[in-house]
Curated annotation (Swiss-Prot):
InterPro entries: Cell_div_FtsZ (IPR000158), Cell_div_FtsZ_CS (IPR020805), FtsZ/CetZ (IPR045061), FtsZ_C (IPR024757), Tub_FtsZ_C (IPR008280), Tubulin/FtsZ-like_C (IPR037103), Tubulin/FtsZ_2-layer-sand-dom (IPR018316), Tubulin/FtsZ_GTPase_sf (IPR036525). It comes from Helicobacter pylori (strain ATCC 700392 / 26695) (Campylobacter pylori). Its main location: cytoplasm. This is Cell division protein FtsZ. SUPFAM superfamilies: Tubulin C-terminal domain-like (SSF55307), Tubulin nucleotide-binding domain-like (SSF52490). PROSITE patterns: FTSZ_1 (PS01134), FTSZ_2 (PS01135). Pfam families: FtsZ_C, Tubulin. NCBIfam families: ftsZ (TIGR00065). Essential cell division protein that forms a contractile ring structure (Z ring) at the future cell division site. The regulation of the ring assembly controls the timing and the location of cell division. One of the functions of the FtsZ ring is to recruit other cell division proteins to the septum to produce a new cell wall between the dividing cells. Binds GTP and shows GTPase activity. One of its GO terms (molecular function) is GTP binding. It is found in: Cytoplasm. Coiled coil: none annotated. The lineage of its organism: Bacteria, Pseudomonadati, Campylobacterota, Epsilonproteobacteria, Campylobacterales.
Amino acid sequence: MVHQSEMENYNIGQASIEEVSDPAYKGAKIVVIGVGGGGSNMIKHLVEYGVHQDVTPIATNTDGQHLKNNPAPVKILLGKESTGGLGAGGIPDIGRKAAEESANEIKEAIKDAKLVIISTGLGGGTGTGATPTIVKIAKEVGALTIAIVTKPFKYEGNQKRKRAEEGLKELEQSSDSILVIPNDKILLTMKKNASTTECYREVDDVLVRAVSGISTIITKPGNINVDFADLKSALGFKGFALMGIGEATGEESAKLAVQNAIQSPLLDDASIEGAKSIIVFFEHHPDYPMMAYSQACDFIQDQAHQDVDVKFGQHTSDNIPIDHVRVTIIATGAERNSGGASLESIATPSQPVVKQTRKVGNGEYLKIPTEEELSIPTTMRIQQD
């Protein structure tokens, strides 16, 4: 069993930077672009979290004041002439025209990128309008594109939700792959008395975990490597992507981490049925038992569709406690809300549900609800809690 002090000294984000900071390491350049207020907030959070040397964070916005305070090394004011740095006023067409006006500046900033991850909050003017245009620009420079987007809270109103859906449909036509994260599902993981600031920070946390999960797979060298070509092959199947990140400690921690990743409630209604490719990336101590790792791999192979291409990767570090495992799972080419099974459906039904927890600032461990619990009306779940 790992002592609490040992766990507190283990920082995955910091380890990510230190372990692969060798100047001789030359990987595929990754650009992460935050679009609009929500996307730029994520970039700010990502910079504070720490990024790999091959990852370039870029903040873009039509709101000059908001952009001015962002710590991103690259900042692009969209539509300087058309908006005057005063924002898009919640009108997607203004956001689109602003991105078109700044197309050359965007193209110059990402010209060497092999992978461009675009993150935004859909429903507003800049994020909804500019993001599809920026995706198209990234495609023009030959980069693979992944859009990681959030959908508005229900309380934000039908008009904003409608704009978000329209923006999502447009993104489907251009982006290689899309990860959709509904804000309402993030809200369900929070304490009942969580503040607005805490909830929005959690939205940023989820976006950062998604971005970091993808970039980690191709920037961390390992005994069993997943490289850019593997990701490119997986993203060749256009459609929605599903991603889960799980951690576990103790006996069979690799298998439990896989189950935790599979049971993540934070992604939108999408179906693993029809997914064309699955990438599984493990991070653990060099002395982690091979048998436990092998059993976790067998578990995934047994539950995945026989025609799905499953690629495994593995990275080891002395900084990770010996019985602790972190796993990132990405399934691509999935269909959204088709009535099929979710990411959880590749778990064996007879397996016990593994409760996920997350440590918050006050030291309290919060239970992250499973998909089954999320089907229970909020008021009923609050009463159960």
